[in-house]
Amino acid sequence: MRVAVVGATGMVGEIMLQVLAERNFPVTELIPVASEKSVGKEIEWKGNTYKVVGLQTAVDMKPEIALFSAGGETSLEWAPKFAAVGTTVIDNSSAWRMDATKKLVVPEINASVLTKEDKIIANPNCSTIQMVMALAPLHAKYDIKRIVISTYQSITGTGVKAVRQLENEYAGIQDEMAYKYPIHRNAIPQCDSFEENGYTKEEMKLVRETQKILNDNTIAVTATAIRIPVVGGHSEAVNVQFENDFDVNEVRQILSNTPGVTVQDNLETYSYPMPIYAQGKDDVFVGRIRRDESQPNTINMWIVADNLRKGAATNTIQIAEYLVANNLV
């Protein structure tokens, strides 16, 4: 199968290539794609050397699948061009997520909505993916009424420039900054730009995407997204109010039985999720599970995942695997 990776030289693109190899995705021809400044560069993949090509060249090669991680503007312009030649596009940007004609997919939750006609498929936001992975099975059992979420997000979600800023600040070097403020020894209560309602785009993604993935616009969601000087993954403090009461041990059991979710919740051994543990792994880790004693039918939990893997690259490739396994591509 001919597979194009659009944004192959970027942070998520590199992880996509890594995950494709790890999961032995059936690639017969790899097409690494990037901006014009990277065309001609060579990358190594599974013992072979490939030259990076431009977008039009990749379209002309008519790959069966194109995995996009090149930003919204690139996706809006080029995803339809790939789709027009028969390529199925799986896009990591926010460009198509809230388009009513496009599917927003977390395979463990709603892959069954996909059909052969879906030529542009949206990958959800990283912070949304890890939250709904934990909440979807609980929604099915107890019916979620309201979610209050605060995120503590890795600088890797911003990209290479942000990682470089942290490394430079740690070393005492003044250089180009990805953020308006220092990130070393700091917490910045802004992820992405602000909308008119005072929330950031990142916060509103959590609201809108959660409702779309769970197929329930009655769920109330409010979010605060914070950038912290961590590289291993995103962490989330999540407070969930259900319509129905629950048993905490049953919640743990449901989560333990959910594919792609690992429960780390042993207070005696100080076992709970942390980015340093989640980094490089594909599971979503859930812990600090406890009843909210201030409000009926409400639970607190702490959710952590590697935002570059399950939050981006791995989820994208899992969608591609589903398409292949079900002859949808």
Write out the residue ranges for each language-model feature.
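N-terminal Rossmann-like NAD(P) cofactor-binding subdomain of oxidoreductases
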Residues: 1-183, 218-220, 284-285, 289-295, ...
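Charged docking surfaces used in two-component/phosphorelay signaling
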Residues: 66, 155-329
